[in-house]
Amino acid sequence: MSSTDSVVAGQAKVSTWRKTDTRWVLGLFGTAIGAGVLFFPISAGIGGLLPIIFMLILAFPIAFFCHRALARLCLSGRSISDNITDTVDQHFGHVGGVVITFLYFFAICPLLWIYGVTITNTFIAFWQHQLLLPAINRGVVALAILLVMAFFIYFGKDLMVKVMGYLVFPFITCLVLISLSLIPYWTSDIFTSFDMHSLSLFGSHGILVTVWLGIAIMVFSFNFSPIVSSFVVSKREEYEADFGREYTEQKCAKIISRASVLMVVVVMFFAFSCLFTLSPQDMAQAKQQNIPILSYLANHFSSLGSGKSTYATVLEYGASIIALVAIFKSFFGHYLGTLEGLNGLIIKFGYHGEKSQAPMKKLNMISMVIIMGSTWVIAYINPNILDLIGAMGAPIIAALLCLLPMYAVWRVPALAKYKGKASNYFVTIIGLLTILNIVYQLM
């Protein structure tokens, strides 16, 4: 074979889209599509038609540019097997590694609290509205649910990992089917209630504030950052030795782009379908009741009474069950991350970073008691979930997903080539706006 033929063959090999790339597109997509998506329609729809259109425009840039920035940071590690912790240690030293460990834990733990509140409220709503049973004490409900989940997690973690993996795509399929099944119930109320004269840009209910608060929920809902480090390591091991780091970066960007498109299409279609079925007033009630949109839809169809169709009855019960499964799936995944983060903090400070000296079985039990105990307290207090996302969950995700990579671009020589890019300013603004949600929640 001539050298020209070799080059052509090499280029063909480089341009090939592999099955592993498709698997990672679906993997990133599946990681993001969880219980957080069940709150996005409430936040997006509460302001009516115009804010959700603005969010539709922002959805892909937020999902793509923010995750690409984090992937570029992960790609800057010296070795192809370096994960984000190794890379941060290289760039910012031991202190930086400790800070990231703290951020990692406090980015995931509030999400676990959010899901603890959510699964309690969802079960209570199902108990009262679908099963038509008398009200029960939420403290007892939360404790019982957490004890059952703790039992399954402690004694069957490996089995649960497999089960949760199998549930990802059935959940996505159910989400799409529910979006389609709502079409017969679409109304024109959202358009007839639209009044240009009553719109305002500013104020607590203005378009800008609604979109600003919606950005935090978008960062929370369109988030597959926990898997980005593993994704980058996998792609570096697959491509970098043969094709170089620049090509690997381009391949990662393409995979993230396709995953983001898929995610935005599914989530935004679900959000619009809910908005066309319900009304902004319904969304406000869902926020006040502190339940996910599927639970509210179930209650909505339940209220139709004896005149409802079999189709509506299936939607009523199906929506509640899917919501419970989705929240449990997200709770389990975030529990493992919280456990890892808390164990990491205890080992770092209690055992001077020597994992081999830590009694892991005892440590796991202590961490479980702390995690489940704090989750029960929050679930009993029942803070507003959307406010909790805006005040705690989304801002810390934004610090890791948006601001850390942008700081690294400014500080780290290996990332200097990305300085001055327009997307950097966009990612930084999104990160700052999300973090400023804390200020709004305190006002």
Swiss-Prot record:
InterPro entries: Amino_acid_transport_2, Thr/Ser_transpt_TdcC
GO cellular component: plasma membrane
Reaction it catalyzes: L-threonine(in) + H(+)(in) = L-threonine(out) + H(+)(out); L-serine(in) + H(+)(in) = L-serine(out) + H(+)(out)
Chain ranges passing through the membrane: 24-44, 45-65, 95-115, 140-160, 163-183, 207-227, 259-279, 319-339, 363-383, 385-405, 423-443
Amino-acid biosynthesis as UniProt keyword: no
Localization of this protein: Cell inner membrane
Topology in the lipid bilayer: Multi-pass membrane protein
Key words, A-Z: Amino-acid transport, Cell inner membrane, Cell membrane, Membrane, Symport, Transmembrane, Transmembrane helix, Transport
GO molecular function terms noted in the UniProt entry: L-serine transmembrane transporter activity; symporter activity; threonine efflux transmembrane transporter activity
Recorded family membership: Belongs to the amino acid/polyamine transporter 2 family. SdaC/TdcC subfamily.
Function recorded in the entry: Involved in the import of threonine and serine into the cell, with the concomitant import of a proton (symport system).
Name of this protein: Threonine/serine transporter TdcC
Species, as recorded: Edwardsiella tarda
